[in-house]
């Protein structure tokens, strides 16, 4: 009946798991502290985001500047000659839409798979509102029909992002999100 969700799962082993556990330990200590502040929380997000490496954890929160996730993703999009995205919720700001369109303008290729069904139809309308600008720039857009889409996957050149962040304003600039970035995928 199409009421189930389609998602993506992965299994991670080794030192990357230890790094993620340290992030969650920091969150647990923040929650248990007598006076948790937003500044303390953002310090955890920033400090635990990996600055380099072929497998990097990138965390996001309500930063006044670009978060490690948003900054790294912008850099990868700017350098990508090929960009593929599967997004449950897709409603970036106009500046980000322009960056996506620039992939095609540079002679690259971009494809987007977005949700055709949702438990919140405003997210579908928001995504469709963004399509016109992308279609004018020859970006190929597909909507996933069989089930509700919950997947968040970005392939920008040789970098792959998988995690909790949708490609919308809340996920990129406000929500606490976790993405793993894998190089040379």
Predicted regions and their residues:
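Charged, low-complexity intrinsically disordered terminal segments
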Residues: 1-185
């Amino acid at each position: 009946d199409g009421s189930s969700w389609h998602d993506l799962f992965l299994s991670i082993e080794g030192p990357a798991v230890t790094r993620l556990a340290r992030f969650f330990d920091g969150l647990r200590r923040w929650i248990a502290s007598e006076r948790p502040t937003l500044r303390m929380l953002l310090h955890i997000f920033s400090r635990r985001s990996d600055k380099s490496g072929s497998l990097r954890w990138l965390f996001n929160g309500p930063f006044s500047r670009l978060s490690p996730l948003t900054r790294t993703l912008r850099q990868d999009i700017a350098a990508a000659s090929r960009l593929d995205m599967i997004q449950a919720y897709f409603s970036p700001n106009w500046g980000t839409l322009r960056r996506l369109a620039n992939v095609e303008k540079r002679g690259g290729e971009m494809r987007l798979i977005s949700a055709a069904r949702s438990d919140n139809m405003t997210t579908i309308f928001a995504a469709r509102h963004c399509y016109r600008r992308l279609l004018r720039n020859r970006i190929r857009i597909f909507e996933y029909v069989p089930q509700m889409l919950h997947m968040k996957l970005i392939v920008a050149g040789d970098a792959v992002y998988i995690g909790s962040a949708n490609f919308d304003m809340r996920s990129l600039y406000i929500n606490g999100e976790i993405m793993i970035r894998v190089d040379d995928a």
